[in-house]
């Protein structure tokens, strides 16, 4: 089980698509529970812990204390990267995966996250590499209208700083689109098609590029997986700073997401929210309902929900069409299975954009 732990609701950025810090009344900026509660969970089951915010590194002392006291199998952190240089290299050795928020090329990242942010995140990635960090460094993109999926993903891979690139679409919870349908038709889907070909061509030459959504879809295609693919409420739970146990880390004010609290003596919080129409869909094995929050809230209504389903299916169909070719490359020893099927455990990569 992965536990996504809010270390604080505070953030040191105010990105265009999320607005910065969480309101204190929903996600307090200080921890309101004892770390002993986390130790009790770790005694009952094998757990991984992902530190989340706000900006999680703003509460670095809490992170250090959890690492010291809670016997988790693996530690993960999702960070904007601005405070990476404030921590000793030995601190980073505790983490199996580090996700750095960066949206692609400099102009796009700075447009959404603030002037100079691209350079600071790239600097953070360099610091990790030069310190000898050997874990998984993931470029975590938020993709919106100024982005170009092919350009931005290939750019980040070309830096040789990131093992994997993952993106999430800024859809459903945002109305800040001039013409979403046109963007999907003329930018996103042509870019996805081009990126799939680029991925396949590199594999034919013996290189597996770390394009996380493609790898995750292929892995689910072969091995299956939980629904939704991020694991929300099935093999991932979130713990807010006030001790509430949530189905999803961004559903901090939705009543449906409140499963329990750390004070309750409840042993199993798992539940499955994803039902029809997703469970009847022919891509459910790969898609798993895509996103629990989007499934439950449907801010764009049924039409918007269905439009996102359609281009998600297109992405899955593209990977399906290449499945046999990819597996043949594995069987011939051209590429290695352990490089291809990613992630090997729930490391907070949502898989479906």
Q: Can you say where each PLM-predicted feature lies in the sequence?
A:
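Canonical Radical SAM [4Fe-4S] cluster-binding loop centered on the CxxxCxxC motif
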Residues: 1-33
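Cysteine-centered iron-sulfur cluster-binding motifs in ferredoxin-type domains/subunits
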Residues: 6-14, 55, 233, 278, ...
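Glycine-centered loop/turn positions within well-structured domains
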Residues: 13, 107, 246, 289
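A short, flexible beta-alpha/helix-coil linker loop
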Residues: 21-25, 105-108, 172-175
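Residues that line or immediately flank small-molecule/substrate-binding pockets and catalytic motifs
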Residues: 22, 53, 102, 169, ...
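Radical SAM enzyme [4Fe-4S]-AdoMet core and its adjacent flexible, acidic
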Residues: 27-33, 115-122, 126, 130-245, ...
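Radical SAM/AdoMet-radical enzyme domain recognition
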Residues: 36-40, 44-50, 59-171, 181
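Flexible mid-to-C-terminal extensions adjoining Fe-S/redox cofactors in radical SAM and related proteins
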Residues: 250-353
